[in-house]
Amino acid sequence: MDTGENVKDITMGNQQVTITRIAWLSGIWDGEGTFGIYRYRRTKDGKWSYCARLTLSNTSEEMIQEIIDIFRSFDITANIWRNPKPRKYNHKKEVHITVDRSESVKKGCEIMLPYLVAKKNRAILLLEFIRIRSEYKRKVDRDPVTGRLKGVIEQGYEDIIHLYEQMKDLNQVGTLDIGSSETTR
């Protein structure tokens, strides 16, 4: 029986990642993972900052290790955090994966995109967010008399805020009327 494992190989460095493994990763992320745009307040000036992030939590060490192996094949940097104790006494300890470097998030979205079903729209939105952020050029505001730096001129935030709001709506938990695929736990 052909499992599809030998359909096509994508060579990355010394390792080969098959289409089957990428499709598997995409299926796992479609069901268990999150494509997100996160907003947080900067401490110095109190303004909002936005970042792209891929996250997944699971209790299977084998699954987490396979995901990490695939990510390493593509030079995707992921942070791993193991919960030291379960949330409840009868629960297993969960492991959390976070990918938050823009280049790694972009690679992750690009390799999974062809195989995503439920969260394809989120991956596309995240890629658009990263594209806008990568094209952003800082413009400084200077005092016209002294030439002294007054700060950075905010630009492009309207598009980013719009994408953040769209992603927030898509990732809303428990609202089936807007097509959320997120599970209430």
Q: Over which residues does each language-model region extend?
A:
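Internal intein/HINT superfamily modules and their associated LAGLIDADG
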Residues: 1-185
